[in-house]
Amino acid sequence: MCEIIGRKYEIAELKRYYNSGRAEFVAIYGRRRVGKTFLINEVFHDDMIFHHTGLSPYDRQRRVSLKDQLQNFYFSLIRHGMEGMAQPKSWMEAFFMLERFLETSDNGSRQVVFIDELPWMDTARSGFLTALEAFWNGWGNTRHNLMLIVCGSATSWMLDNLINNKGGLYGRLTGEIKLYPFTLKECEDFYHSRNIQMSRYNIVQAYMILGGIPFYMNFFNPSLSLAQNIDALFFSRNAKLGDEFNRLFNSIFDHAEECMDIIRILGKRHAGYTRQELAEKAKMIPNGGFTKMLKALISSDFLIKYVPFGSSNREERYKLKD
C-alpha cells in the first residue's frame, strides 16, 4: 500500500469491518474525485476477489442501456476467472452468477467484493435494486467471510436507495463511510509528499480554488507556480479540467443541465437566494422535482441551506458551499 494522506479514521473503520468475522455490507460515498476508489484499492489491493465499476453515462452518443451494464458486469466476472456461463439477461441472473463465482472461489479467507459507481448501474426499469436486495438478503448476509463494499459519487442516490432505504435493504448496511475533501493540513501534507513547494499562503489559495479534492491537486506540476498551474488546468488550450464542470454534473445528476443552471445562478450572489427566488431566476416550477434537485445538490456538497441572522425559517436561503 502506498502512502495515503489523511484518511486514518476511514482506514481504521475499513480494517475493523474486514476483521469482524461476519458478513459486512459497507457503503462509501462522497463527492466525485474525492478519492473513494483510490482508498479502497489501496487498502484492499491484495484481498479483493472481485472488482467491478459501472459504466459512466457521460461522453456517449447514446444513453447507456441495461444490456451495456450487464455485458460490462459479465466481462468483469470473466476477467476475475469465471468460466462456463453465458452472458446474463437480467440483474437477477448477473448476481446469481456472482454468487456461483464466489462459492467456487471460496477458500475460507475473507472475500472482498468491491462494486464501484453503483448508481450508474441502476438504469431505468432495470430491476437492479431488487436484484441487489436478493443477492444480499438471500445469500450474502449468511456468508461470514464476505465483505461487500459499494461506492458511488451520486450521493443523493446512495442516500435514498441504500443508506436511507425503506424497502428490502432497510437496515441491511453494516457500515457507511462518507469521504470528505482534504483539510487544509492534509492539503499541505499532500503537496509536500509530491515535492510541490508552496508557501502556506499559496496552499490556502489553492485550497480555495480546488476545495481539497486530491484528484485535482494531483495534476499540479512541481516546476510551475500556483498561477501557472491554475492557468494550465483551467484556462489554457486543452486544459485538463476545462470541461470538468460539464463532465462532473452529467455523471452525477439526472437533470444535469438544470442543476448546472442553479449553480451558475448561485455563483453570482454570495448570500444566495430563497427557494422561490431561485426557482424564478432559473425559470423552473418550484415543485417536488425542483426540491429534489436542491436536495441532490446539498447531499453532493455543492450547496448549503441556511437562515440569515435575524430571519425566520421561512426565509431559508440556498448558497454555494465552496
Predicted regions and their residues:
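Phosphate-binding site recognition
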Residues: 1-321
